[in-house]
Amino acid sequence: MKYKYSKIFLILYFFSFQLGFSQNKISLFSEINYNSIPPVSLNEYKSVQERDKKFQNPNIALGVAISGGGSRAQFFSMGVLLGLEEINEENSQRNFLKEIDYFSTVSGGCYSAGYYLTILKNKLYQGHQSFNEFYFSKADAYKDYVNKSASILSLLNNNKNEKGDKISMSQQLDLEVLQYDCTNPDNPDKCKTQMLLSDFFIPKESTLRPYLPMMVANGTAYNNGERIAFMPHVIRGLNINSSLAPNKATVCLDENEVNDGYEFPLTYGITASSAFPGVLPKTKFGIKGQNKILCIIDGGASDNTGYKTLLELLHSDSKVNDKNKKALFIDCLGQGKKEPYITDEKIKLISLLETTSLYTVQTRYMTFDRDIENAFERYKIPVSNYQIIGFTTLRDHLLKMKKDESYQTIMAELKNADDDYSNWLKFYGKFKHDLVEQFGELSFTRDKDGEIILATLTHNKFNELTAANILILYEFASHVETKLKITPEEREMLLLSGRLATFLKTKELKNLLTENK
């Protein structure tokens, strides 16, 4: 009897197997109805040059692109933004940070720009504090990171990752980075309104006047790798009508059938741009009238630097002459190019994944300067109208410095130390102690518990940093891995690195603020 049933089972299995194959019909590529993603354009929006002239020169279009790189990118670029505020124009209320017209951001770089613009809208315009004063005095009330950890091992458990958390990433971003506490509207330390694309993009027919820079988060279409710039006309053109956020229920974007793009929450753009496959859930949107979804992943898959969207924004700015279109690229790639040789050992899966992802990013970085210059020439913008700030800014400066005995001692200690975080903590402790001894406690700000905040070293002391100081700062910061969760020590070193790198470019950055007649 068992044999009989087993035989019947095998026959049914074979039949279903054959049927399954017979149902896999040929898909005709000639019948694919491809709808392209709307391109970057400023045609339907009021110009950012209409903002208050006290704070920005309407004759210069200044854009900043911030690359991806997880929390390393977030806090290094945050340090750069803090440093940009310290570059003031002569006889003016303007500074480089206020002059910025456009932000093009990718992945971790979205967090710093999103945080700054949220604070600019809700706090700085209402008070008389600088961004530096607010950031370092309100750090306890205003978190600027998502308390979520991830590792490369999550790549091996993608099914669990795709189910998402009880609280979606977009909700966490709103609460912890964009400061919108929808669960507790009486919270005095949080913003009462959600950041929407309408905060940055004002339609031409509106009676409102632009007062914020434009911020564009960049994502990548999962199915074909095409770049998606989160702008109102792009959202509307894609017929998005819902967000399939990775939680228990579909979260509608608004009450309309199709979102008009202006009421699109910024948090969705940032979430999509930072959705690194296998580490954070893919961001999925419902499309009106189609039994399909739009799945968006990390913007770094299509352009990890954000330069393409930024140059398209500058090119589309019809109010400013091409010779006065300027750009700053914040490059948050920490490690340098790896040597091609490895030890003769069995190649591990995790090492293979790491090397493959690094190669994908670095093949683009290898031609970065040439790509930028080619794009500038194509758009008829002078190739002298851009600067790059990154960890290489610190390294290049370090190479020119005079090396003394203390530098050689630190170099030897670094070379002989294991790449273990406990050792990095020891280097951090000594570095902090040496700076306080060297410059005095009054050169720093303290937190609410009276602890010195290392990242607040006053910028007029930067010229006095020694080669040994900068060596530790550079090596510590550039060794921070691309990850979500970050330690307080890593945060401090990244912020200080960003501020110092910006200071080292002061002359070049001031030239970008000079109007070409």
Regions found by a protein language model. Give the residues of each.
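Bacterial N-terminal signal peptides that target proteins for export
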Residues: 1-9
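Bacterial N-terminal signal peptides
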Residues: 9-20
